[in-house]
Regions:
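N-terminal membrane-anchoring alpha-helices
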Residues: 1-23
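Beta-strand-turn-beta hairpins that frame and shape the catalytic cleft
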Residues: 16-29, 114, 122-134, 154-156, ...
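Membrane-embedded segments
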Residues: 21-115
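Active-site neighborhood of phospho(di)ester-bond hydrolases with catalytic His/Asp-centered motifs
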Residues: 30-32, 56-62, 88-94, 117-120, ...
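Short, flexible loop segments at the rims of nucleotide/cofactor-binding pockets, characterized by
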Residues: 33-38, 65-69, 136-140, 157-158, ...
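Solvent-exposed loop/turn segments at secondary-structure junctions
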Residues: 63-66, 94-98, 122-124, 138-141, ...
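Binuclear metal-dependent hydrolase catalytic cores centered on His/Asp/Glu-rich metal-binding motifs
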Residues: 100, 106-107, 111-114, 121, ...
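Conserved beta-sheet core of the metallophosphoesterase superfamily
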Residues: 165-243
């Protein structure tokens, strides 16, 4: 079980969109639920991410744990990511929200160049492609979602970052092309055929635990994360980050 929480894998996922021309693609690295994991070889992970050469890097919350006393390990991760690409976007998770020094942590990462986009949206141009990168806070309400997407250009590809996969679903509509989230840890402990036994916010045998979920014109993707909470245990569920490629087919 120790290797399940210390030796990471890269989960590659491909999505397609008619909002990009054929032969165009957007490369994304998603990191979620790191929980200040000191067991991971960060130098190796940075090397792997650099070789992937992502266009943007997204952090979908719980990068620290609510028990984290020293932010040094996580700040080192953040600085390493910024050296690879300055396009790093972040939304808070419940552990940042719960931490007694959570606001201090958020203020610092913003100061060093991390783009915090809780209830906000950034319009960016990546290699000629116009993209909306939006985010919502963990305890979102409809007004928060509307604030995040109110000024998007509907003909541009829109990514929504949300720590929780299930909380925004009652609000999300076709304005959003791709939702990237975490929070579930894939259940941490999984069983063959059954999948996740339990996930926060969903209880036993969750509907949304990890992977890809088509939702009409929107797609939800849940990364199972790089860390653990409560107990340092994973089973049939190795820690990971995701390499996401959005390919054009217009």
């Amino acid at each position: 079980m120790y290797t399940q929480i210390s030796s990471f894998k890269i989960n590659k996922v491909i999505f397609k969109t008619e909002k990009f021309n054929k032969n165009d693609e957007l490369k994304i690295v998603q990191i979620t639920d790191f929980h200040d994991n000191k067991r991971i070889n960060k130098a190796k992970m940075m090397k792997e991410i650099k070789e992937l050469n992502p266009d943007i890097i997204v952090l979908t919350g719980d990068i620290i744990d609510f028990k984290t006393e020293d932010f040094t390990n996580t700040i080192s991760l953040m600085k390493g990511l910024l050296k690879i690409n300055s396009h790093v976007y972040f939304v808070e998770g419940n552990h940042e929200l719960r931490h007694k020094k959570g606001q201090e942590f958020l203020s610092y990462i913003k100061k060093i160049g991390i783009n915090i986009i809780d209830n906000d949206c950034k319009k960016v141009i990546i290699n000629g492609k116009h993209i909306n990168i939006c985010g919502v806070e963990f305890l979102l309400e409809k007004t928060d979602f509307e604030k995040a997407v109110s000024n998007i250009e509907n003909d541009k590809y829109t990514i929504l970052l949300s720590h929780s996969p299930n909380r925004p679903l009652i609000y999300v509509d076709s304005r959003v092309d791709l939702i990237l989230s975490g929070h579930t840890h894939g259940g941490q402990v999984r069983l063959p055929v059954v999948g996740a036994i339990v996930a926060p916010g969903q209880g036993l045998f969750p509907k949304y635990d990890k992977g890809v979920y088509p939702l009409g014109n929107t797609t939800l993707y849940i990364d199972s994360g790089l860390g653990c909470s409560v107990q340092p245990i994973r089973f049939l569920n190795k820690v990971q980050f995701s390499y996401i490629i959005v390919k054009g087919e217009r």
